[in-house]
Amino acid sequence: METVNEPETGEVSKDAVIVKQEKNNEYCLQDIDDKLSESAEDDGEDDTNDEDDDEDSNPKKNTQAPLELMAEFLRAEMAREYQLAKKLCQMILIYEPENPEAKEFFTLIEEMLLMEKTQNHEQDGENSDEDSSGESKGESDEELSDESSDEGEDGS
């Protein structure tokens, strides 16, 4: 009668699994290194102008406006400094020409600037009307006071 060690035949030892995983990792790492070196060497061109080439050849490359610029834009918008907000929004659109929020804000800011401009013209018009009407009102007040003083003299 032979005794068979069932746990050893049915199970793989932990050490064997670890060794196998280490071998797989070595192969994976080596494959990755090989692929990286191949991709770096395959163009055979001078890499000094890669930054310029990447921008021209890859128009879908996402360039984002600096967060500081966006934060400054929001501060200007919240403070209702629309001239500054418009300039900052234009700068954001230079970085991100397809930014839908910046496009929307730009049109709204232009509308707000037009509204402010018309309000300023109306206020200037009212101020000039008040100045001219104030003079005529002052003249009429003087005439009334002259008449009342005349009446006082006539009545006595």
UniProtKB/Swiss-Prot annotation:
Compositional bias segments (type: Acidic residues): 39-56, 140-156
Domain of life: Eukaryota
Ranges for region Disordered: 29-66, 116-156
InterPro entries the record matches: ERICH2
Name of the protein in its database record: Glutamate-rich protein 2
Native source species: Homo sapiens (Human)
Gene that this polypeptide is encoded by: ERICH2
